[in-house]
């Protein structure tokens, strides 16, 4: 019996939501070799320091670590190599225009399988300042306290 792994995140970049304000997301395919996709299916991928750039009308993902496949022998490739992302031309043009602004970056948020293909959820993001991070933590804590009080009140 085949497990249903569709849209189940194989890797998430949790630090991205803390360090960046994400204002637009894109779903992109990723070009991988055979041994890389096998490692991705085993969830041996890290998105922590990843980012993407537009070069010559193509989007390239850098600094994403995919561990070498254990039985891959000579077919394994470099772990941190740049990988091509598959997006529509209109999306690439929009991303290129946004990235030309200052303080904007294009980062991977999660990797998942969709219809057997590896997909990367990418986000256009602006870096948060330290006081923004503290403010969002306070807001999150206040919301938790309110939810806790409502739960106690409704019992």
UniProtKB/Swiss-Prot annotation:
GO terms for molecular function: RNA binding. Transmembrane segments: none annotated. Keywords: Cytoplasm, RNA-binding. One of its GO terms (biological process) is trans-translation. Its main location: cytoplasm. GO terms for cellular component: cytosol. It is found in: Cytoplasm. It holds the Pfam family SmpB. CDD domains: SmpB. InterPro entries: SmpB (IPR023620), SsrA-bd_prot (IPR000037), SsrA-bd_prot_CS (IPR020081). PANTHER family: SSRA-BINDING PROTEIN, TMRNA-BINDING COMPONENT OF TRANS-TRANSLATION TAGGING COMPLEX. Belongs to the SmpB family. Required for rescue of stalled ribosomes mediated by trans-translation. Binds to transfer-messenger RNA (tmRNA), required for stable association of tmRNA with ribosomes. tmRNA and SmpB together mimic tRNA shape, replacing the anticodon stem-loop with SmpB. tmRNA is encoded by the ssrA gene; the 2 termini fold to resemble tRNA(Ala) and it encodes a 'tag peptide', a short internal open reading frame. During trans-translation Ala-aminoacylated tmRNA acts like a tRNA, entering the A-site of stalled ribosomes, displacing the stalled mRNA. This is SsrA-binding protein. It comes from Lactococcus lactis subsp. cremoris (strain MG1363).
